[in-house]
From Swiss-Prot:
The gene is HMG1. It comes from Gossypium hirsutum. Keywords: Endoplasmic reticulum, Glycoprotein, Isoprene biosynthesis, Membrane, Mitochondrion, NADP, Oxidoreductase, Plastid, Transmembrane, Transmembrane helix. GO terms for cellular component: endoplasmic reticulum membrane; mitochondrial membrane; peroxisomal membrane; plastid membrane. Catalyzes the synthesis of mevalonate. The specific precursor of all isoprenoid compounds present in plants. This is 3-hydroxy-3-methylglutaryl-coenzyme A reductase 1.
Amino acid sequence: METHRRSSTNSIRSHKPARPIALEDDSTKASDALPLPLYLTNAVFFTLFFSAVYFLLCRWREKIRSSTPLHVVTFSEIVAILASVASFIYLLGFFGIDFVQSLVLRPSADVWATEDDEVESEVLLRNEDARHVPCGQALDRSIRSLQPPEPIVTAEKVFDEMPVTVMTEEDEEIIRSVVCGMTPSYSLESKLDDCKRAAAIRREALQRITGKSLSGLPLDGFDYESILGQCCEMPVGYEQIPVGIAGPLLLNGREYSVPMATTEGCLVASTNRGCKAIHLSGGATSVLLRDGMTRAPVVRFGTAKRAADLKLYLEDPENFETLACVFNRSSRFARLQSIKCAIAGKNLYLRFSCFTGDAMGMNMVSKGVQNVLDFLQTDFPDMDVIGISGNFCSDKKPAAVNWIEGRGKSVVCEAIINGDVVTKVLKTSVESLVELNMLKNLTGSAMAGALGGFNAHASNIVTAVYIATGQDPAQNVESSHCITMMEAVNGGKDLHVSVTMPSIEVGTVGGGTQLASQSACLNLLGVKGASKESPGANSILLATIVAGAVLAGELSLMSALAAGQLVKSHMKYNRSSKDVSKVSS
């Protein structure tokens, strides 16, 4: 407690007070609320009390003698009763003035500093150490210093630590305006023309509104200009996620160090072991099967026949070239590949598939679809466009259409793992892996009714690589569609393992790929930005690396399961020894 007291005192002394706190003449007193000096007020109410009581006693004695009911009172008696009650209330408060005086400068431990002293309130709110003690404890140090220290037992409220933020008077006015709702938080960037300053002001306003600290969320060291209008709105800081490296992954004759951003212990280590097994066995091979981003608007007609007419028109090969020309105007990289339609009554779903170069391509294909819809209004004026996306795409949702038709990059990756490597590195046997894969990834997933989930943990690797390289983490839903196959080859001595992933949605330009950290990870893989020699080559390479990393992760986890090492490894690498119950929330 003494440590907190000293730190609070020192930190407050470091701030220049707006006005000195007088200890004698200028100190606030409870009697300041009275209209007259204390000695005059006391004399008036003492005299009034005893006079009124004496008058009432005399009147009651006369009523008793004359047999007059006591409850029958005259106007003068009513005035005397009121005077005696009022003076009694004053005298009762007078005897408690000393007690009130001792508390008048010390706010309750359960409230923030009051608005009566604006400057002291701001110092208290900005002082980091003041959060460790009851509010106001640091402010009344001069008062307590005049009294002998006595142990006081109070119920202290634990406040979050508030970071020390240097704000100008202008910033302080803006913060108050945001807190009271006069200035919308989302408009700070446009009003201030300074993204870093806007984030700092928004952050401070949020802390004051919620009473919760954001001291653990970093603010400095980030380029807020880079995310304006592109990655995130109304920022108050940025997250820190550790990035580990798995590899080298030997894929198609080249080595790659795979960055993985994750908070799950054992994940990078396990994937790294899989990479080692693949490398010692001669590497893995990956092949691109399809490359096309999709978007499926939904339109409605008055009759199902009219919806069928449009379906036949769109699927007629003679009309495809015209539609492709209209679609491809949206971008110099966009190339319409196909249009597939599905009817539900009067509603028609049009699934456009488009090559998008090195971009993930959602915006590109959406603009192309809008061009085609505008073009179709000429021949089909009764077509009502319900939505640019009708979920037949299907984006960020597990869907059979993605599992069957594919979305983004469809990749298959395979490797033959030597029997000696299976035994020495993976600590299991070929036979055990093949049996476990059949019963877990195939039969077990079928029993669960899985859709694209015929794997051990593909989404673990996909999400970790996506976060590290600036992809959309929400698209791990369809991107993690994967079927893992294992088979004994070469007379049962070696293991053939493969992963087939029909919907890897990645890009090397746009979105989060332009952020400094994510751009560095893309550069590590050699896929930063757009390919100048062959448009789309970088995003295709990134997709194959994702598949290769998934292959390594599947191989290692399945081996741990087959050898009974899963629980042991997670107890070693995926448990925290920190006592989180002692961390203030």
